[in-house]
A protein has these predicted regions:
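Outer membrane beta-barrel strand-and-loop segments of large Gram-negative receptors
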Residues: 442-446, 493, 588, 594, ...
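Outer-membrane beta-barrel signature, preferentially recognizing the C-terminal barrel domain
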Residues: 486-489, 529-532, 560-614, 632-645, ...
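Surface-exposed extracellular loop regions of Gram-negative outer-membrane beta-barrel proteins
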Residues: 245-260, 299, 303, 327-331, ...
Length: 803
């Protein structure tokens, strides 16, 4: 009876929490072994109940097809439905709340396009699989089924979902990017609207060779993130980032893709690729090989006004062609010891041989009177050999500490020989030969740590880049002369980014420090005036939240834009007897401040950015040496420029038709010296895109895309309007193993943009008359399809781009 009474009293204490103790149980207080045993068991039950109050809460969110859903909002609630904390699912649909939450009772799961769910939290904290069903709305007798938006916001990124959308059938990553909002261009030549050329990543590895985009099948892509205001963990010169994430790899064995593309513009060219992989266990071996060959055509007209003691007008018409042969190869491996540790390395090489020739005529007027007529012929041979590039990486986790290390080495040599023959009606004829040899090499490494911290996480790391660019130029043109220059640069950087969640708000703070030592040498002698050392801090700040169905994000960054090595190259190239072209070793880096706002609601999204640039680098002209009649086209720092840019878009689905509409505008505030006064270059540039995907019978996809861009000012240039109409048919066979793509791009040949460069003494009008109408046929065969495990992120890619 005594034992039973002890059990009842102890059980009541457990149920009310009074039996919870933090000190070890003293069994001496019990009068019998039975009571001691019973008391110990009840103590352990109470201890387990106490631990349950501090458990982690986890779960996984999937759609009706059991596919993981990322970017889903998960809110932790008390019994009275008051808010405790919030989280977002990762790429695998998983969410987790750490220990120590305040008496949680429910989780509420919500995502645009899906029905919300509120679920009880089990004692273990493991909720398991949560299935979200598409939201349906009854309108009269019609049921409208909502779809998950293709584009959404995650933190400071605009995320476009590829998996499960029509973009899966686009073809390659190149084709996907042409359909991503804010991304302009094609075939590896991409830019982000208002932000210039982006750094592109695939699974966290920075893309060093843009041909990799054509090697990645669209069906293997999960989503694409566009970051228009990247933070401290990116190089201070990176103004936009595109991150491509693929689906998880599956299966072992040998796999590959064979791809052949024929392109007909004015001349024919071909792009052929073969990619192979062998996978067993955690080991993956891969090799990629490719060839690009054919002939390219270009034609343009240039009108140049030069104001000196004599007003010179030059009217130049030029037609040219280039034949290219490029081979490239890449081989490497990756090994996953387990889900927490992987290593890998690759080596790539290739060579490019290009032969070009051009013919032209030029009419020269002096003070409006005929002065001379020139006939010009030129040819050049450009060879790049070798193009060494190697990468080594380690990616792992030690407990909750994430580690990512990358090292890159690059070395290449370029040789360019030129011949120019000018025949004059009234002056001496000119015959110029030149030979330029440039060498570039780079060693870079990057180490990044990540760790959970307080209400979020912290990332910190360092980056080191050592680079050299040398140029030797020899010519028999007495006006220019020979040149021998070299640039050495060392960049050491450290950065930290902290992300925290406070209720419905996500806050990110970052800081990057860069020490750059720049040395410029001519004929082996260091030029002190042109050699610089920079020590800079680059802060960043971001804030994001979700109010009902509206996603909002705001960010600030401080960036820089360092001149490319070509911009710094003191070599002067001969164009014609009145015009030379060269770099400027005295250039300073730009200083850039940007504030950005982003928002998304259902299928609509918008973005706006204000940018202030100090010492912007732009084209300009100066008299060359003591000859005021000869002008040098070069680069220079201007005082300042301000930009305002906005972009809005929406996507819809009407039966088999999936249209997307995007509208953007860029406006700058810039005043320059022009002629005898000042000139404002403030005209905005507008953009309109109308993209259509139609799912035809027999699983055929038809894409019809239209774009129009207005005239306006960009830096000290005035650009004319342009437009294009593209159409594409895509059909896959044999369970997507074989596909055929037919494309017609720029059907009406209206995509050329004419530009006018405005300077104090020289105005250059360039009219691009190249035929851009292109027809393409692509055949692709894939066997044993699998996805890349290589996790190297790459280091020093921005230096490679500067080369």
């Amino acid at each position: 009876m005594k034992t039973l009474l002890t059990f009842i009293i102890a059980m009541i204490c457990v149920l009310h929490g009074f039996a919870q103790k933090s000190e070890p149980l003293d069994t001496a207080q019990f009068s019998s072994p039975e009571e001691a045993l019973l008391g110990t068991l009840l103590y352990r039950m109470a201890e387990k109940n106490e631990n349950a109050l501090h458990r982690s809460i986890t779960g996984k969110v999937v759609d009706e097809n059991n596919s993981p859903l990322d970017f889903v909002n998960v809110v932790l609630l008390r019994a009275d439905s008051t808010y405790i904390a919030g989280a977002v699912t990762d790429e695998n649909g998983v969410f987790q709340f750490n220990e120590g939450q305040d008496n949680p009772k429910f989780v509420k799961v919500s995502s645009i396009g899906y029905t919300n769910q509120t679920i009880n939290i089990p004692p273990t904290g493991n909720i398991g699989i949560i299935i979200l069903n598409p939201e349906s709305v009854m309108l009269g007798e019609v049921v409208v089924k909502s779809n998950r938006p293709v584009t959404a916001i995650k933190g400071d990124a605009l995320v476009t979902n590829v998996a499960g959308s029509q973009l899966e059938h686009a073809g390659t990553a190149n084709d996907v990017l042409t359909q991503v909002p804010m991304v302009l261009g094609r075939d590896g030549n991409f830019e982000v609207f208002g932000k210039g050329s982006p750094a592109i990543y695939i699974n966290g590895r920075e893309v060093q060779d843009l041909t990799q985009l054509s090697q990645l099948n669209s069906v293997d892509i999960k989503n694409v993130e566009v970051i228009t205001n990247p933070g401290a963990k990116y190089d201070a010169s990176v103004k936009s980032v595109i991150r491509i994430r693929t689906k998880r790899p599956q299966g072992d064995g040998f796999s590959g893709t064979l791809r052949a593309q024929g392109v007909m513009q004015k001349y024919f060219r071909t792009v052929d690729q073969a990619n192979f992989k062998f996978r067993t266990g955690g080991l993956e071996l891969f090799g990629n090989f490719g060839y690009i060959g054919g002939k390219f055509q270009s034609s343009n007209r240039v009108d140049m006004l030069t104001q000196s003691s004599t007003v010179w007008n030059q009217f130049l018409t030029q037609d040219g062609s280039m034949r290219t042969n490029e081979f490239f190869g890449k081989a490497g491996f990756s090994y996953m010891f387990n889900d927490s540790h992987s290593i890998g390395a690759y080596y790539s090489n290739g060579f490019t041989k290009q032969k070009s020739e051009h013919k032209g005529i030029s009419c020269v007027l002096a003070d409006g009177q005929p002065y001379d007529n020139l006939s010009m012929y030129g040819r050049s041979n450009n060879n790049t050999l070798p193009k060494h590039h190697a990468n080594l990486y380690y990616n792992g986790e030690v407990g909750t500490l994430g580690i990512d290390f990358n090292m890159d080495y690059m070395w290449r040599k370029n040789r360019n020989s030129m011949f120019n023959d000018e025949t004059s009606d009234t002056q001496d004829n000119s015959l110029v030969n030149s030979l330029g040899v440039s060498r570039s090499r780079m060693l870079a490494e990057k180490l990044v740590f990540s760790y959970p911290f307080w209400k979020g996480g912290i990332e910190f790391g360092e980056e080191y880049t050592s680079s050299r660019f040398s140029s030797e130029y020899n010519t028999d043109a007495t006006l220019v002369g020979n040149a021998d220059s070299r640039v050495d640069e060392n960049n050491i950087a450290g950065f930290v980014e902290i992300g925290q969640t406070f209720g419905q708000f996500n806050l990110g703070v970052g800081l990057r420090y860069e020490h750059v030592k720049f040395e410029y040498l001519e004929n082996g002698q260091k030029k002190e005036d042109q050699s610089k050392t920079y020590n800079n801090l680059f802060p960043s700040l971001s804030l994001s939240t979700m109010i009902k169905n509206v996603q909002l994000s705001m960010s600030y960054t401080h960036k820089t834009q360092r001149p490319s090595y070509a911009d710094l190259d003191g070599t002067v190239d001969y164009i014609n007897r009145f015009t030379l072209e060269g770099g400027n070793p005295f250039l300073k880096p730009e200083k850039i401040h940007s504030v950005e706002l982003m928002g998304a609601w259902r299928q609509f999204f918008g973005q706006m950015t204000y940018t202030y640039k100090k010492d912007p680098i732009m084209n300009t002209t100066y008299p060359y040496a003591d000859d005021a009649e000869v002008k040098l086209i070069t680069m220079a720092n201007f005082p300042k420029i301000q930009n305002l840019q906005a972009f809005v878009g929406a996507q819809f689905k009407v039966g088999v038709w999936q249209p997307k509409v995007n509208v953007g505008i860029m406006k700058q505030w810039l005043t320059i010296d022009y002629a005898d006064g000042r000139k404002s270059l403030n005209n905005p540039i507008g953009l309109m895109q109308f993209q259509n995907a139609i799912h035809l019978p027999y699983d055929i996809w038809l894409n019809v895309d239209m774009q129009w861009m207005s005239s306006g000012n960009d830096d000290n240039m005035k650009q004319t309007s342009s437009s294009y109409l593209n159409a594409k048919l895509y059909k896959a066979f044999f369970n997507n193993q074989f596909s055929i793509t037919l494309e017609a791009n720029d059907i009406f040949n209206k995509s050329n943009r004419d530009a006018t460069l405005l300077n104090k003494d020289v105005t250059i009008h360039k009219f691009n008359t190249t035929n851009n109408r292109t027809f393409m046929l692509t055949l692709q065969y894939t066997f044993n399809s699998s996805r890349d495990r290589y996790r190297g992120q790459g280091a020093g890619t921005n230096e490679m781009n500067r080369f």
